[in-house]
Design a protein with these regions (language model features):
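Beta/alpha (TIM)-barrel catalytic core signal, keyed to glycine-rich beta->alpha loops juxtaposed to Asp/Glu
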Residues: 1-158
C-alpha cells in the first residue's frame, strides 16, 4: 500500500477489523502512522470498541470508519427503530430513527459513518443526519438504554 501511495495510485490507505492488539502492532511499524483509518462495525448495538479501540484511535488522531452504523435497523433483532428513547429523540429533531443512529455514530467528529442506501431518499436523509447535534441529555438517555461497555469486548463482525 505504501508503494501504491508513493506512486500516486492511492491517496491513503487503511485497515479493517483491527482490534487494539492489531492496531498496537501496526502503529509500532515505521509505516504504521501512515494508516488513515480502521474500518470496524460500530453502532448502538455494537459499542464494544468504545471501551479501548476508540480512545486509542483518538489518541493517534485516526478516525474510526464505522460500517453498519444503523445496525441494519430491525433486521438484527435489536429493534432499534422501535426503541422508545430513540423514537422520542427522533421526534425532538423531526428526524427518523435511522438519522438519530447516524447522528449518534458521528457525534464526536472522530467517526466516519458509511451507511448503506438503497435509494436517493435514503441518501438525502443520511446526509441530513450530519446536521443533528445530539445534546448531552440525549446522549445520557441513549447511554441508559445502550450503555458503553465497562470491559474490553471482542470486535463485532458481520
Amino acid at each position: 500500500m505504501e508503494q501504491a501511495k508513493m506512486e500516486g495510485k492511492i491517496k491513503s490507505w487503511g485497515v479493517s477489523n483491527f482490534d487494539v492488539n492489531d492496531m498496537t502492532k501496526l502503529l509500532k511499524l515505521p509505516i504504521g502512522q501512515h494508516c488513515a483509518t480502521n474500518q470496524v462495525r460500530y453502532n448502538l448495538g455494537d459499542r464494544g470498541i468504545d471501551y479501548d479501540l476508540v480512545p486509542m484511535m483518538n489518541e493517534n488522531s485516526m478516525p474510526v470508519m464505522a460500517y453498519a452504523p444503523v445496525a441494519r435497523g430491525d433486521r438484527l433483532g435489536s429493534d432499534l427503530t422501535k426503541q422508545k428513547v430513540l423514537q422520542g429523540i427522533s421526534k425532538k429533531y423531526n428526524a427518523d430513527v435511522f438519522q438519530i443512529l447516524l447522528a449518534w455514530c458521528i457525534r464526536n467528529g472522530q467517526t466516519i459513518a458509511i451507511p448503506q442506501s438503497s435509494n436517493a431518499k435514503h441518501v438525502i436523509n443520511n446526509v441530513k443526519a450530519a446536521d443533528i447535534q445530539l445534546t448531552e441529555e440525549d446522549l445520557v438517555k441513549i447511554n441508559t438504554v445502550y450503555p458503553k461497555p465497562s470491559v474490553s469486548e471482542p470486535l463485532a463482525l458481520w
